[in-house]
């Protein structure tokens, strides 16, 4: 939390960002949130996921309401993910698995951080603890929040809660490999930091949540180096 506060303070020290955040905070405190009018909405597809169609008007930046517009939302649910560091080997734990939506454009098999969908009534922390056990066989004790973000806000409501955690061989409680009921076939991949940076530089990591996690780790380690150097 202290790191997050420091980051926010540093970001807000930039003149442009400072005025932007100040305006947004004042709007929230005064209840001046922009208006949205939902004229009608309906579910047009309902299988594993849902697609919602809505007609709405929204407040434009000039204060006027827009004309009625049609929007589609892919309702996939929210997810949780975690970047794991093996404290015994000082290697980052990733997974590799087949992802059919990426098969046509490639590569099909992706390097990713551990992740899973948040079940109804479940908190993201519960989700990621379960997924870490299922996919790589570790029991996680401490979770450090990195960020919560929208995956593709132009068409999907899905958010991912991303965490960082350290594990060791003493935390291994299962074989991992994924859920047989979900027909998962997951291979655990451990990369040293130089190997991870090389994979990033060569474009071998193409999953967005994993890119965010790895770049966060780079910033975190760079910050630690700067502190040591002062």
Label for each model-derived stretch:
Residues 18-20, 71-74, 91-130, 172, ...:
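Conserved Nudix-box catalytic region and its N-terminal flanking loop in Nudix hydrolases
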Residues 44-89:
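Acidic, metal-coordinating catalytic segment for phosphate/diphosphate chemistry
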Residues 178-204:
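NUDIX/MutT-family hydrolases
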């Amino acid at each position: 939390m202290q790191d997050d506060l420091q980051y926010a303070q540093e970001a807000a020290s930039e003149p442009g960002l400072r005025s932007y955040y100040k305006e947004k905070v004042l709007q929230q405190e005064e209840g001046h949130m922009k208006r949205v009018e939902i004229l009608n909405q309906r579910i047009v597809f309902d299988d594993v996921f849902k697609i919602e169609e809505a007609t709405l008007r929204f407040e434009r930046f000039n204060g006027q309401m827009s004309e009625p517009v049609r929007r589609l939302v892919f309702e996939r649910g929210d997810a949780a993910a975690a970047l794991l560091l093996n404290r015994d080997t000082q290697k980052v734990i990733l997974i590799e698995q087949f992802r059919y939506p990426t098969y046509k454009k490639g590569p099909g098999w992706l390097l990713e951080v551990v992740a899973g969908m948040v079940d109804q009534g479940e908190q993201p922390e519960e989700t990621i603890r379960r997924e870490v056990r299922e996919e790589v066989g570790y029991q996680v004790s401490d979770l450090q929040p990195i960020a919560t973000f929208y995956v593709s806000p132009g068409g999907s409501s899905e958010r991912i809660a991303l965490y960082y955690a350290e594990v060791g061989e003493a935390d291994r409680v299962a074989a991992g490999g994924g859920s047989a009921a979900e027909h998962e076939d997951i291979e655990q991949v451990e990369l040293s930091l130089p190997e991870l940076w090389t994979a990033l530089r060569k474009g071998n990591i193409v999953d967005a949540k994993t890119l965010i996690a790895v770049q966060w780790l780079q910033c975190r380690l760079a910050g630690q180096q700067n502190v040591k150097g002062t």
